[in-house]
Amino acid sequence: MHMKPIYVIPLAVIVVLIIADQIARKRSIDKATRLYASGRFSDLVDYLDSWYPRLFYMSYIRQRMKFKAFEAMGKTDLAEDCLDLLFASSPAKAQLADLLIQAFTFYMSSGKFKKAEEILARIEENPDLKDAAPELRKVYEIQAKGDSSHIEEMETQVSKASGADALRLYLLIAKQYENKGDNEKADFYRAKAKHVNS
């Protein structure tokens, strides 16, 4: 059975429009990625507020990109506003787990320990993050509360660690020695961390 020409033309137009839309979306995402990668964070925010991303990006993705840009620019208040919008958007289960980790990291690095503790409580209640929660609790206690009770444990762990794990452990050990007032040991472990990072 052959389709009548009158039906073939609209079908062809629809297919062309779908392909054109997919190409436009890919180019748009590529442009946003390039702006971020090249450190043009202000330009990225302007682009994300332009008509095409506002119309065609999922709101969650657009806000997340803006959060990352504001965080990179050091605009803490604007980044925090984006986080509030992201949490208010009722993210999917996997998105929420990722968002909680990002929010915890952001608040800890910004020195907003009260907010970090609130997020940590949510992390500890989230079954998808049960493996990460104890380690994040240690990070919080070390950085926000001046804890130094994990030195021996972490020194044992770091002897078998490499890459990002070793870097994280060296920095946490250094912070604990700093908390104890042993600046010589703190400097020693910071130097080790710098060596891993180079």
Regions found by a protein language model. Name each.
Residues 20-30, 55-64, 92-101, 127-137, ...:
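Generic helix N-cap/helix-start motif at coil->alpha-helix transitions
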Residues 1-31:
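N-terminal signal-anchor transmembrane alpha helix of single-pass membrane proteins
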Residues 30, 34, 65-72, 105-106, ...:
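Residue-level signature for tetratricopeptide repeat
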Residues 38, 73, 110, 144-148, ...:
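Structural motif corresponding to the intra-repeat A-B loop/turn of tetratricopeptide repeats
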Residues 29-50:
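Short juxtamembrane segments adjacent to a transmembrane helix
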Residues 44-74:
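Acidic, Ser/Thr-rich low-complexity segments on the non-lumenal side of membrane proteins
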Residues 170-198:
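Alpha-helical oligomerization segments
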Residues 43-51, 76-88, 112-127, 148-162, ...:
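Alpha-helical repeat scaffolds
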